[in-house]
Amino acid sequence: MQDIGEAVIKIIAMPSDTNPAGNIFGGWILSQIDLAGSVAAKEFAPERVVTISMKEVVFKQPVFIGDLVVCHAKIIKVGTTSITVIVNVTAERYCKESHARICQHVTSAEVTYVAVDSLGNKIVIDPDLIRYRGF
C-alpha cells in the first residue's frame, strides 16, 4: 500500500507512442511523469493543482514497444502554495535469452505543482493538512 502523497502509474508502451526511430517518444514519457506527479499531489491536497515546472529530465535508457513503463511519484516538499514531487521512471521488459524480466531506470524528474482556485489564482494549501500529513 502506498502512502498519501505517493502514486504509481503503470502503462504498456504502444506502437502509437513511438518516434520516427521506433523508440517510445520522449514527450509521451514526460506526459506520464506529469500524470503520476499530479496524482500524488492531488491525493495529498484536495485543491486543483497545475504544473509550473519540471526540472532537467535526462533519458538514460530507451523505452521500446511492449515495455511496461512504471512511474513512481513521491512528494518531497510542500510549501505554502506548492507541492514538489520526484518521479522515477523504469521500463520493464522480458529478455528472451535469459528468460528473465529486466528492469531499467529510464529517467527521473522533479516536478512542482501549485494549488489554484477555479480562476487559476494561487491559493494556500491548508496548513493543518500539511502538518497532519507530516510536511
Predicted regions and their residues:
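HotDog/MaoC-like acyl-thioester-processing domains
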Residues: 3, 7-9, 64-65, 76-135
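Generic hydrophobic-segment detector
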Residues: 12, 16-17, 56, 63, ...
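Hot-dog-fold acyl-thioester-processing enzymes
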Residues: 1-50, 114-135
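Small beta-barrel nucleic-acid-binding modules, principally OB-folds
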Residues: 46-62
